[in-house]
Each structure stands twice: as structure tokens, then as C-alpha cells.
């Protein structure tokens, strides 16, 4: 395993981290409980020390499973979680629709205490605002509350996790430029590079580390869909999207197959190397759903890095819409 330091902190994160949503929700398909535990345990054995979860994943289960499976190694690991969604509202959630958000000081303090309890720990390494809109980010009292939690030793550092659906440019720029955050979590992959690409210079200038999730673009870059599209489980988020988005993604994937090096670097490994070529990205969070994912994705760190020539070709493809008839990228991650 390779490690990268989160700027202005003492945290050394594994270059490949573990996004706990795959074992805390069914958004990426169902996994047996025994397999969930095995994935987490084997991730640590393979060198992963960074685990990213959220209170909303499985209504707290994404934190509880870390305590249950990895609690005995707590001091060796970096636990990041997120807050901002009111998971305590008894109103049933409507499918995958976004919950109501709350960022007032009292709620933030309450949410932090509940996360500490579920994680079975007295401190959180990285506490992230979960998909905050600009109206939350401009509230000084929110960040004063986070600083107080930091002073009390309940959280070590705080950051933002920027979400899907809206452009997020304003939120990203404001967070990186005007708030003393340690990290910003973004979506960044071969198929979806903006607005993360736009944030990289700002992140470098302000010494903020970027964390990149879904580098495989809903598994279109893993080979899973090379021979057709499956019928997704109803709980899988991909079941609620039209096939057109997958079809478009696979047309783009066909343009970047030159990255594959037979017996040396798979497409999935190339996708991880593509993300980690950016020095501002401290850790990449692929979706681990089976044991072979651990071997392949962590193994990406031992494969040839993306060359400058390959990067230049990738940049040109991105700028020209992957040479498709429709030059505007339509693929969007969650």
C-alpha cells in the first residue's frame, strides 16, 4: 500500500481507501453480512487504513459496522464520517430521494455525539459536511460549532463532501477558498472530470486534500458491462436510471481502451491510476463489493502509472466529448 499525507494534518491516508456505502447500503447490489465483514477485514490486511462512511448510510449502520468489525483496530485506522441529513426524522424515506438537511449548531452537536456512539469511539478523524449547499456553507455558526467540536477533541479535522445532481462549482470554490477545511470529497473519474478538475488548482493553493469517490463511474470502467447490461436489483441506484446513460458511458469507455496493458494494467486499474495521477487527490474510494475487487483495485498501485502522453490523449478526448456525436458529456454519477 502507498500512503499520501492530508495537507496541514498529521493524517496519512492509504492511496486507496474504502467507501463504506457498498457494505452499508444496497445501492451497489446486495452483499451478505458475512461477506461485508470479510471485505472490511481483508481491506485492513491489504493495507487500507482509510474508511469513509456517513451517518445516513443505512441509517447509522455504516458507522456501526465499522465499530463491530474494525473497532479493535480503531487507533490504527482513519475513520471519516459525514453529517447533515436528518436521519432522526421518523418520516419514512421515499426511495432514493434526498432527505431533509439540517446544519444548525444544536443538530450538528447531536449528530456528532450519535456518530461517536455508533462508531464506538471518542473521536472522529475527519468529520465532513454531507452534500452542503451554499446556504449552509456561508453560515459562520456552523463552522464555529465544528471548531468547538475540534477543541473538545471529538473531531480531529473537518471537511466537505460535495454531492451529485447540481453543478457544485459555487460550493466547491467557496469551501476551498473561504473555509478552513482539511479535505473536499468529489466525484472524479475518466468519464466525469468536472467540476473536480476545476477545483484542483484551488485545492493546491489552499493546501486542501481532495478525496475522490466512484473512480469507476458506476462500474462502467471495470469491465462489468462489456458484454451487456444486467437487470439491477430494485434497491440498486442504477435500476432507477435509463439504459441510455450506460450506453453512452460504454461508448466513451471504448475510446479509452488504449489505457489497458495486457497482463499489466486492467481498465479498472487504469481508472484508479488516472485519478491518482493528480497530486491533489490524496485517496481514491472505489466501490468494493467482492474480494476480487480488493485484489484488483489495490493492485492498481503496482501497475504502470499513466504516462504524460496517455494523459495528454485523455485530456484531448475529454475536451472533444470523447469524439462522440454529442459533444456534451451526459454521464453523471451519483
Predicted regions and their residues:
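N-terminal binding-site loop/beta-alpha segment at the start of enzyme catalytic domains
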Residues: 1-78
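Conserved, mostly hydrophobic/aromatic
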Residues: 6, 18, 36, 51, ...
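Short, well-ordered coil/turn segments that N-cap beta-strands
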Residues: 11-16, 47-49, 73-77, 121-125, ...
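Active-site mouth loops of central-metabolism enzymes
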Residues: 22-34, 94-106, 135
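Short, acidic/polar
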Residues: 30-43, 104-118, 166-174
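A short, structured active-site edge motif that brings together acidic residues
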Residues: 76-88
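Active-site groove signature of glycoside hydrolases
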Residues: 116-135
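Beta/alpha (TIM)-barrel catalytic core signal, keyed to glycine-rich beta->alpha loops juxtaposed to Asp/Glu
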Residues: 132-317, 321, 331-334
Amino acid at each position: 500500500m502507498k500512503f499520501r499525507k492530508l495537507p496541514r494534518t498529521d493524517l496519512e491516508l492509504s492511496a486507496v481507501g474504502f467507501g463504506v456505502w457498498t457494505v452499508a447500503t444496497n445501492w451497489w447490489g446486495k452483499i451478505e453480512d458475512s461477506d461485508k465483514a470479510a471485505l472490511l477485514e481483508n481491506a485492513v490486511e491489504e493495507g487500507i487504513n482509510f474508511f469513509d462512511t456517513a451517518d445516513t448510510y443505512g441509517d447509522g449502520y455504516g458507522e456501526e459496522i465499522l465499530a463491530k468489525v474494525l473497532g479493535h483496530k480503531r487507533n490504527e485506522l482513519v475513520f471519516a464520517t459525514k453529517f447533515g441529513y436528518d436521519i432522526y426524522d421518523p418520516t419514512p424515506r421515499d426511495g432514493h430521494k434526498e432527505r431533509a438537511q439540517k446544519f444548525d449548531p444544536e443538530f450538528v452537536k447531536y449528530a456528532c455525539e450519535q456518530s461517536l456512539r455508533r462508531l464506538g469511539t471518542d473521536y472522529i478523524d475527519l468529520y465532513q459536511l454531507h452534500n452542503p449547499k451554499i446556504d449552509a456553507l456561508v453560515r459562520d455558526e456552523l463552522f464555529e460549532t465544528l471548531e468547538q467540536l475540534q477543541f473538545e477533541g471529538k473531531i480531529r479535522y473537518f471537511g466537505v463532501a460535495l454531492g451529485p445532481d447540481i453543478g457544485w462549482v459555487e460550493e466547491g470554490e467557496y469551501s476551498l477558498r473561504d473555509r478552513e477545511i482539511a479535505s473536499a470529497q468529489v466525484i472524479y473519474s475518466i468519464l466525469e472530470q468536472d467540476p473536480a478538475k476545476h477545483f484542483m488548482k484551488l485545492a493546491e493553493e489552499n493546501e486542501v486534500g481532495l478525496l475522490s469517490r466512484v473512480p469507476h463511474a458506476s462500474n462502467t470502467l471495470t469491465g462489468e458491462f462489456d458484454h451487456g447490461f444486467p437487470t439491477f436489483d430494485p434497491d440498486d441506484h442504477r435500476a432507477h436510471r435509463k439504459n441510455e446513460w450506460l450506453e453512452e458511458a460504454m461508448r466513451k469507455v471504448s475510446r479509452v481502451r488504449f489505457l489497458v496493458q495486457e497482463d499489466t494494467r486492467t481498465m479498472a486499474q487504469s481508472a484508479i491510476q488516472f485519478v491518482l495521477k493528480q497530486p491533489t487527490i490524496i485517496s481514491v474510494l472505489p466501490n468494493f463489493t467482492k474480494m476480487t475487487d480488493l485484489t484488483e483495485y489495490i493492485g492498481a498501485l503496482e501497475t504502470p502509472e499513466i504516462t504524460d502522453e496517455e494523459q495528454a490523449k485523455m485530456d484531448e478526448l475529454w475536451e472533444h466529448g470523447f469524439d462522440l456525436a454529442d459533444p456534451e458529456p451526459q454521464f453523471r454519477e451519483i
